Structures are given as C-alpha cells and as structure tokens.
C-alpha cells in the first residue's frame, strides 16, 4: 500500500487510527459526507472503539438486554443493535457510490464479498446471508455491517472481530437476532497482528469496490481532539452535538 501526495478519483485514502471514541468518529464522518464534492477522494477510516453499544435506525431498545456499565447510543446508521470494543477492527467507508456505480444492494454485496475474500485468504470459509447482513462462519457472525447513504455518498461501515472479548455480545440480541452466536479471527485459529490484518482487509475491500488504496495521514479533527485531550480541554469541543444516550 502506497502513500501519495496526490490522488485520482478512484483512489481511496486509508487512515489508520488508534482507539477513538464513537462520538468523534460519527460526527466527523457525517461532516465529511455533508461537505464533500464530486472530486473528493473516498476514504476508509480504520480503527477501534472503546466499549459501546450502538442502536441503528431500526434498533429496538428491547434488544439491549443488560447494558450494564457499557454506554448505549442511538446512531443514524442502518440496522439494529451492535457492539464495538477492543479487539475489533472497525472500517468506516466514506464512498461516492454514484461515482462507483453502485446501488445500496450492490454496495453491501461488495463489502461482504471483500470480507469473505479476506477470510478465504486466511483459510476461513465464510458466507453472507440474504436475511441478515454480515459475514458468518459456520453460523457464527464474525463481521457486521451498518451503513448510511446520504447525498449519493455513504458513511458508517463494517466491523470485524479479531480477538475481542465476546461476553458483551451476550448483553444484546446482535442485530436484533436472539441467541446469535459470535466468533473472532482468533477463535478460527488466526492470530495476526492488528496492523497486518487491517492492511490485508483494506486491500480486499478496495479491490471489490474498484478502488486503489493510498495510506494517508490522520485528519485535522483527530489531531485537534488529541490536542484537547493532552491540554485538558474538552475532546468533544469540535463536535456539533453528542449522540443521544438511552
């Protein structure tokens, strides 16, 4: 994967973050989507979140069984309830789907197939399901999807379980499905370091989407947030609003 000072319309800027809070990412990717133009490159944001449950637009509070100390927020992505936490890689996809020539169904299929291709390269046989977006290994869910399309562009994206603690999943009905088993790469016998795993995943996703990945620096909103944290300021001061908590 290369880092370039210039881009073409079919380049995707890949930004690798450490652990980032959900609110900052959500509002930053929404802001990017609202202000992008037809010449702007697509972006992948690759990161982890601290523990959090998020309810999509179709989410029902009764699918949160026992949140305990883990925050629950309402999100504007599609889908039901999901969990994010350490040991899970999240890839947010800011894509111009008109430029890519994809409808919503084609987009979901391309993302799922990119994940399936990645898992196949590791010797893991995985499938998607018509009745439940995501990627599954012998019935257990290893990757989740949740997208928002606005102004011909997408944000939000996917999450794949690397080596995370699966116990928080028992506190919800994952994506609204009762007793849905979950799994991880590690449980499937794969023990890749995070950076290598993420680079490989991005490569397969970009190929399925017809994009060329170009590694890029972290964005200004993240650097500003880090400065606020370091100086004792409000890390959310650059955000327009906080998500609604349940």
Swiss-Prot record:
Q: What InterPro entries does UniProt report for this protein, alphabetically?
A: aa-tRNA-synth_II/BPL/LPL, BPL_LPL_catalytic, Octanoyltransferase, Octanoyltransferase_CS
Q: Where in the cell is it found?
A: Cytoplasm
UniProt keyword NADP, yes or no: no
Quote the catalytic residue positions.
175
EC numbers listed for it are: 2.3.1.181
One GO CC annotation: cytoplasm
Report the record's Gene Ontology biological process terms. Answer: protein modification process
Q: Does the keyword Transferase apply?
A: yes
Identify the residues that bind substrate.
Answer: 77-84, 144-146, 157-159
Judging by the UniProt lineage, the source's domain of life is Bacteria
* CDD domains xref list: LipB
Instruction: Please state the pathway this protein functions in, per its UniProt record.
Output: Protein modification; protein lipoylation via endogenous pathway; protein N(6)-(lipoyl)lysine from octanoyl-[acyl-carrier-protein]: step 1/2
Q: Where is the BPL/LPL catalytic domain?
A: 38-213
A GO molecular function term, named singly, is: lipoyl(octanoyl) transferase activity
- Kindly list the residues the record flags as site (Lowers pKa of active site Cys): 141
Span list, region Disordered: 225-246
Give the UniProt keywords, A-Z. Answer: Acyltransferase, Cytoplasm, Transferase
Q: What does this protein do?
A: Catalyzes the transfer of endogenously produced octanoic acid from octanoyl-acyl-carrier-protein onto the lipoyl domains of lipoate-dependent enzymes. Lipoyl-ACP can also act as a substrate although octanoyl-ACP is likely to be the physiological substrate.
Remarks, miscellaneous: In the reaction, the free carboxyl group of octanoic acid is attached via an amide linkage to the epsilon-amino group of a specific lysine residue of lipoyl domains of lipoate-dependent enzymes.
Q: What name does the UniProt record give this protein?
A: Octanoyltransferase
Gene expressing this chain: lipB
